[in-house]
Amino acid sequence: MNSWWTYVNRWIFSTNAKDIAILYLLFGLVSGIIGSVFSFIIRMELSAPGSQFLSGNGQLYNVAISAHGILMIFFFIIPALFGAFGNYLVPLMIGAPDVAYPRVNNFTFWLLPPALMLLLISALTEEGPGGGWTVYPPLSSITSHSGPAIDLAILSLQLTGISSTLGSVNLIATMINMRAPGLSLYQMPLFAWAIMITSILLLLTLPVLAGGLFMLFSDRNLNTSFYAPEGGGDPVLYQHLFWFFGHPEVYILIMPAFGVVSHIIPSLAHKPIFGKEGMLWAMLSIALLGLMVWSHHLFTVGLDVDTRAYFSAATMVIAIPTGIKIFSWLATLTGGAIQWSRVPMLYAIGFLILFTIGGLTGVILSNSVLDIAFHDTYFVVAHFHYVLSMGALFGLCGAYYWSPKMFGLMYNETLASIQFWILFIGVNIVFGPQHFLGLNGMPRRIPDYPEAFVGWNFVSSIGSVISILSLFLFMYVMYDQFTSNRVVKTNPYLIPSYFDDNVIFVNEKLGVAQSIEWLLHSPVHEHAFNTLPTKSI
């Protein structure tokens, strides 16, 4: 009984940022698996023209799409990249004993499982929410979705919003007030900065989403007409409010991945990151510009031509700081003693390639004239999946990089690299052909299509099967890591270096590192620092 209570005390009532981070990671993986199941349903339905599995039920197809989008964004990438890595690594990197508000941190996590339950109940209620992850009225209004499904989905999103807001306040307070003596904000590692910028974006945009969703809720239940034209409202208002959150949201999703890659590449190329200040200002610029471009999602609603010109230009400008980041990573790789075959390095290189492709299609879509043709086609789907399903997801596989530090156990590098190649090939086969479908005008969110599109759709669905196989292999790699007892006590990525004058931190027992967390014991003790670390130079 006592051991059971210890277990509950550690995992349910936890105030330790590292334990909460592991809960976040586990929660994110479970949600990601459920989201992958929904995506598999979508791809199987589209594997051939006509009705395949959903017996012609278009509403059910749209429910699968809504569930897939919301699960992957709010319940997979944010908890896993922002929640898990943010909580685990930020306090270690800045030399803090924990986050600023440990109990709020616990509450922040435990808001998510009820939110997930609400979303899944919503999908199973009456006809389910068929509005996509964007939940646009009038499709999401009481006239089109009369049951409680959309209300439950709105409530679920509000809970995740509260969770992210509290988590952001917590991490910002931690970074401002709890840095090790002598460590200035400017000297923080890039990952900590990425989390800081992500938190600021969340705090600025989530209240707008909350307001927009609450007005939708009151339109549905309290007889207001914010978005109902018959009462003097305007559905386009919702689109503005939603995308003012929704566009910074995509930078919120990718920013921690930027931070992860900025640690993996220097560590495995044995060089300091190229242009750390430039990288930092690039991230800040991306965040600032990201708040100023939301209407590029609305080019088709009849905006003024000057407005379209501004939003096109502003969107293209984001390519500049993004390019700075890509070229700085490439410059870091140049001339380094690179460990090409290490799994985190494979993911970092994959990230660079695929994120660049996603960025290029983004520049195409930023042209308002072209976007009017491409809007709501599979070209857009291919674009943002290259950025998210390959950018954020490959960044998330930085879990491979830090997992020996988190668990003190090494993964099987051979299996993990096989898993990388299967995933890399799989996602490209899924989303590459979707560019061609979009160029030919195949619309999004439609469960059927003319036979002319069958070729590339079939290829795409084959890719989906390959990706799901890589997911199963990933689960086995995790199982193997926890059961095969390959204990790691030091930094597993260190190799003997004969010309190493770039050492930043040294610990006699554990070797050298570019950021402080690698100098700690693996797995990190509950109290990582016996005394506060002090920066001497």
Swiss-Prot record:
One of its GO terms (cellular component) is mitochondrial inner membrane. GO terms for biological process: aerobic respiration; mitochondrial electron transport, cytochrome c to oxygen; respiratory electron transport chain. Ca(2+) binds at E45, A48, G50, P447. The chain crosses the membrane at residues 22-42, 70-90, 104-124, 152-172, 190-210, 241-261, 279-299, 318-338, 345-365, 379-399, 418-438, 458-478. It comes from the Eukaryota. There is a cross-link at H247-Y251 (1'-histidyl-3'-tyrosine (His-Tyr)). Mg(2+) binds at H375, D376. Heme a3 binds at H383. Cu cation binds at H247, H296, H297. Its EC number is 7.1.1.9. Binds 2 heme A groups non-covalently per subunit. Binds a copper B center. Fe(II)-heme a binds at H68, H385. InterPro entries: Cyt_c_oxase-like_su1_dom (IPR023616), Cyt_c_oxase-like_su1_sf (IPR036927), Cyt_C_Oxase_1 (IPR000883), Cyt_c_Oxase_su1_BS (IPR023615), Cyt_c_oxase_su1_dom (IPR033944). It is found in: Mitochondrion inner membrane. GO terms for molecular function: copper ion binding; cytochrome-c oxidase activity; heme binding. It catalyses: 4 Fe(II)-[cytochrome c] + O2 + 8 H(+)(in) = 4 Fe(III)-[cytochrome c] + 2 H2O + 4 H(+)(out). Pfam families: COX1. O2 binds at Y251. Keywords: Calcium, Copper, Electron transport, Heme, Iron, Magnesium, Membrane, Metal-binding, Mitochondrion, Mitochondrion inner membrane, Respiratory chain, Translocase, Transmembrane, Transmembrane helix, Transport. Its cofactor is heme; Cu cation. Belongs to the heme-copper respiratory oxidase family. PANTHER family: CYTOCHROME C OXIDASE SUBUNIT 1. Component of the cytochrome c oxidase, the last enzyme in the mitochondrial electron transport chain which drives oxidative phosphorylation. The respiratory chain contains 3 multisubunit complexes succinate dehydrogenase (complex II, CII), ubiquinol-cytochrome c oxidoreductase (cytochrome b-c1 complex, complex III, CIII) and cytochrome c oxidase (complex IV, CIV), that cooperate to transfer electrons derived from NADH and succinate to molecular oxygen, creating an electrochemical gradient over the inner membrane that drives transmembrane transport and the ATP synthase. Component of the cytochrome c oxidase (complex IV, CIV), a multisubunit enzyme composed of a catalytic core of 3 subunits and several supernumerary subunits. The complex exists as a monomer or a dimer and forms supercomplexes (SCs) in the inner mitochondrial membrane with ubiquinol-cytochrome c oxidoreductase (cytochrome b-c1 complex, complex III, CIII). This is Cytochrome c oxidase subunit 1. It comes from Schizosaccharomyces pombe (strain 972 / ATCC 24843) (Fission yeast).
